[in-house]
């Protein structure tokens, strides 16, 4: 006996329904055509056709369509749990609201989208991507943390001098065990901060400028005094007169005292007087 469902003609499918060794599942199920035909023929004596109704996701019609897609006879018996075509999908994907082979993605869409979203340490969701999740390269220079001694020395230098020449920068970097680039960057940032504070509080900056000028003047005065003191000490160490100059002076004095100088007209003057 060959039976063709009306829906198969509409779908353009023709599947032979010969089953030399029909499978008898442990638990009877209404999803086999033989069971449906057997029940309908037993009740009416003639094969009854199902009335065309709107199929539901769990109706026998959707299972019938699934049977057209796969043969209903097997050469060897299979496990009863997989007699339903959607059982394998249910076992692999788990139970869901769409227990139907027509919906291969049995899990809700939110579960798949949740798998693509990752939360970082700050709690902000990030869309997962192999390009987004690549580790970010750190900046070559990096943020340098100066020690307290280095900061104090840099501040002292900045109070007296806002700009450094290359030799001074090199000398200061060598003294503080820093690189010239680090010293240059620190002075640039410090000048920017100084300008910002100057714009916000001009009166306070004037006081700072006067104090810095006073400090500079005091330092210059100390330098001048030290230079004068050194010059005085050096002058005291030197002799007042050299021996050669003293000998020449003595010789000149002796010559003047020992020699007699004849003055013209002296004799005539004396003769006239007498």
UniProtKB/Swiss-Prot annotation:
The keyword Repressor applies. It is found in: Nucleus. Residues 237-248 have a biased composition (Polar residues). One of its GO terms (biological process) is liver development. Keywords: Developmental protein, DNA-binding, Homeobox, Nucleus, Repressor, Transcription, Transcription regulation, Wnt signaling pathway. One of its GO terms (molecular function) is DNA-binding transcription factor activity, RNA polymerase II-specific. Residues 197-274 are annotated as: Disordered. The keyword DNA-binding applies. This is Hematopoietically-expressed homeobox protein hhex.
């Amino acid at each position: 006996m060959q039976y063709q469902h009306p829906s198969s003609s509409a779908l353009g499918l023709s599947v032979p329904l010969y089953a030399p060794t029909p499978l008898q599942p442990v638990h009877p199920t209404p999803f086999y055509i033989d069971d449906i035909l057997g029940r309908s023929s037993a009740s009416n004596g003639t094969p009854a056709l199902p009335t065309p109704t709107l199929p539901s996701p769990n109706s026998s019609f959707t299972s019938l369509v699934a049977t057209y897609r796969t043969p209903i006879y097997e050469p060897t018996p299979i496990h009863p749990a997989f007699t339903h075509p959607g059982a394998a999908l249910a076992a692999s994907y788990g139970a869901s609201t769409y227990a139907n082979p027509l919906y291969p993605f049995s899990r809700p869409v939110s579960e798949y989208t949740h798998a693509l979203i990752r939360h970082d340490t700050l709690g902000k969701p990030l869309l997962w991507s192999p390009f987004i999740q690549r580790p970010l390269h750190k900046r070559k220079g990096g943020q340098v943390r100066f020690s307290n001694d280095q900061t104090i020395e840099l501040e002292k230098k900045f109070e007296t001098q806002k700009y450094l020449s290359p030799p001074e920068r090199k000398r200061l970097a060598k003294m503080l065990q820093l690189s010239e680039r680090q010293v240059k960057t620190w002075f640039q940032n410090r000048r920017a901060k100084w300008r910002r504070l100057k714009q916000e509080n001009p009166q306070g900056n004037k006081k700072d400028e006067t104090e810095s000028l006073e400090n500079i003047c005091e330092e210059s005065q100390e330098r001048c005094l030290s230079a004068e003191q050194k010059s005085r000490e050096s002058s005291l160490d030197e002799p007042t007169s050299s021996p050669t100059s003293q000998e020449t002076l003595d010789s000149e004095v002796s010559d003047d005292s020992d020699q007699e100088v004849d003055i013209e007209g002296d004799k005539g003057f004396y003769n006239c007087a007498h």
